[in-house]
Amino acid sequence: IWGSILTTVFVVVMLFTNSYKKIERSIIAFVSVIGLSFIYELFLVKIDWSLAAQGWVTPSFPHGSMLIIMSVLGAVVMPHNLFLHSEVIQSHEYNKKDDASIRKVLKYELFDTLFSMIVGWAINSAMILLAAATFFKSGIQVEELQQAKSLLEPLLGNSAAVVFALALLMAGISSTITSGMAAGSIFAGIFGESYHIKDSHSQVGVILSLGIALLLIFFIGDPFKGLLISQMILSIQL
């Protein structure tokens, strides 16, 4: 719980004291750390790439796995980020540009959206591959995130467990930042305004979304299951 409180405070301060460009660079840095962390982890395990490719092309749906499947979909696509990308597009004030400039920027935003989804898919795939090559192969059932870190130590060593925890922390911070910005954008849009962190409506949207999410944590008995359900809700939003 204290970790959630500190993360929320850190994100609110970061959003309220930095420009969009600085926040964008910070998110790129966070995601880079996540990607490099899981690349490092994958080098420590033996992956059956033929089975992995088969799973990507012809996935199976075991009984009782629908919750996990939907949560992975929500974690990869993250519909609130689509709202955020829409806000970015509108903020360019296309009415002051010609059609060629508009098409160019729209193509860039399309590429940016697809690229972010591909990166999200790659990171989630890396997590699944890591779990398959360690926990599933060893017949270990993981029921909470802290257990996952602890179980990685005897399997891959202390450094792998620390890197895994660091990657999860960076993932939590980056997703909290984007969800807060998306909420601020949506709330400001209700009043016909664009997202700007100095605007009171944008600030209220950020505080409401992160504050409510933080309060819900106090009522969730099983954080691991709560995480799965929250990501499943994201997939339903699609």
What is each residue range found by the language model?
Residues 6, 61-73, 121-131, 154-173, ...:
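Select transmembrane alpha-helical segments in multipass membrane proteins
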Residues 30-42, 63-67, 205-211, 237-238:
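Small-residue-rich segments of transmembrane alpha-helices in multi-pass membrane proteins
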Residues 32-58, 69-89:
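Hydrophobic alpha-helical segments and their helix-loop junctions in multi-pass secondary transporters
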Residues 8-29, 41, 215-226:
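Membrane-water interface regions at transmembrane-helix termini and the short interhelical loops
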Residues 138-161, 187, 191-195:
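Membrane-interface interhelical connector segments
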Residues 73-109, 133-134, 185-190:
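Helix-loop junctions at the membrane interface of multi-pass solute transporters
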Residues 2-4, 159-161, 173, 189-221:
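Loop-to-transmembrane helix boundary motifs in multi-pass membrane proteins
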Residues 89-93, 98, 118-147:
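Extracellular/periplasmic helix-exit of transmembrane alpha-helices
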